[in-house]
Amino acid sequence: MLLAYIGPGAGFVLGGTFVALIVGIFTGLVSLIRWPVRFIYRTLRGGKAYREAKVKRIVYLGLDGLDPKLCEQFMAEDKLPNLQRLRAEGGYSRLRTTFPCLSPVAWSCFATGANPAKHNIFGFLSRSTKTYMPELSSSVVRPPSRVLEIGKLEIPLGRPEVEMRRKSVPFWKLLGEHDIHSTILRVPITFPPEEFNGHLLSAMCTPDLRGTQGSFSFYSTAFTRVDESQGMRIPLRKTETGFESKVLGPQGPEGDALEVPFSLRRAKSGEHWELEVDKRTHELVPGKYSEWIPLRFSSGMLGSAKGIVRVLITSTEPEVELYMTPINIDPESPALPISYPENYAVYLAKLMGSYSTLGLAEDTWALNERVIDEQAFLDQAYLNHGEREQMFFNALEKTPRGVVACVFDASDRIQHMFYRTLEPDHPANRGRETEAYTGVLEDMYKRMDDLVGRTMQRLDEDTLLFVLSDHGFESFQRGVNLNTWLHQNGYLVMKEGAQFDQDFFRGVDWSKTRAYAVGLGGLYINRVGRESKGIVKRGEVDALKRELAAKLDGLVDPERGATAIIKVHLSSDLYKGPYLNAGPDLLIGYNKGYRASWASVTGGVSVEVFEDNSKAWGGDHCIDPDLVPGVLFSNKKVLVDDPGIEDLAPNTMSMFGLKPPRHMEGRPIIE
């Protein structure tokens, strides 16, 4: 999950449930009345649209983070037979990624065919130019604009306002304008869903019901008070019949978290446990995840919000401990729009049962915090993966023409948490048993290969298949705190007496600070006219950027004697577009084994520039892009030597006989 759970806050879900129901019923009736006319019109026009097409259908199977080095190694060892067959029948190439090498950036380039300065996504996090605080880069959720105040109560009138910060136009919307249908499943940076001629389920950066990017709850009989510093740590109180506690949900009208009480007891048989919540009893087996459990957070007559969680008993002695996933938005009754059309999420839930809707559904932070172990993390990742497979194969069946695009996240999340098993000397392995997990990555690659094989079996000769990843992977052993380096070199100034190791730039004297770092991508200049407390004048900006780049190029880690930063680039040298100034001014090309430190990401200033990364998150890709390309397999031969992820959008347009629009910078790669 994003460090510190950067999110829009809670309290955004109440008050709109009844309104949404009425709107949904009305919309459904209108659609039903219009359907025959639309069907005939689209059939006639759609037939015309496909006459110029070179293929009937394009399928994008996205395996986030699949690494070319490991793919090539396992293929050489004959361990990935389906990818080997796909390579032989069509082709394989390393796929040039983006800078920064982050999923939000890369998949936005995939969707739009444009560079970050045109689509406005430079990473997971941006920053407020008013407060310097980190912000979610992809979307913002605001409370309803109209509120009824009754004393201390604030009753929202209507649904929350959700703004998409990604700019430019994705290829599926352009295809839809020509009546070419697309089904888009869990492609990052699709929240909130945009209206187009097709179906879409949102992905990365879709919040949980509390408004965060994924805040778990952990219950223990050892806790005496609620602690919200990293996830939610909540006491589990003993009763005459077992234990009891509460689920803390979104904020209610009075500002406090709405609660759902629950009880936990050992079953009379002694073989399992029973969790009772919302008048339903759910069977729990220690060490095994529950099914999705529905929760209803009520504020009386003011409305309610529904969520779903999975629960895992992690210990029964000496303490009873319970892990609960972040509260996912219930797909059967979404509190926020998570699909287009809105009833598509409901349709999938009716078809296959409840499923994870959180953008970052695999709880990496719970493993970092050691509230779950490695096996529990793997179990969760593959449960989510199984849900995605059901959606994907349903889409293949229901979309015989047009585009099907689905991104699977397990490959990325598992490598983040288990890449360290390839390196016995990784700092995160100290004092931990890792030998049992040395085969996890190979097993994951074999599972992804099996998915590719089952996909190929379902395709006909008129379907163009791409299997791709947005980036590769490398080790993350050492963190680099750029804010500390800036401080030590006089570019970032602390107030007199300010303490170190604080997040969100606490203690920074902006009246004397010329540069700062936030997020994973790079550095910002504290500019006059852009930042609220900027001090660097327009005529001084370019010289300062080049000065910083020259000093940071080749930065050496004194403890290891290794080069930590290969090259620093001016973003203005790499990208052109209307949103250039929204991104970092300098992009940092880290070497293998290095990355921005955890503290630096959220605006912290540490005592030392370099530090060991001791978290389970021991693999990463936010480094120099030449070190972490993605992969591109196809059942047709790729005709260019250096394909980039931005090439796929214009290639899609071209394959359907359409001229790519001017904003797309890539080129067609298959005739």
Predicted segments, located by residue:
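Active-site-proximal N-terminal segment of extracellular/periplasmic enzymes that hydrolyze or transfer
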Residues: 41-92, 101, 177, 664
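Histidine-centered active-site microenvironments of extracellular/periplasmic hydrolases
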Residues: 469-520, 575-629
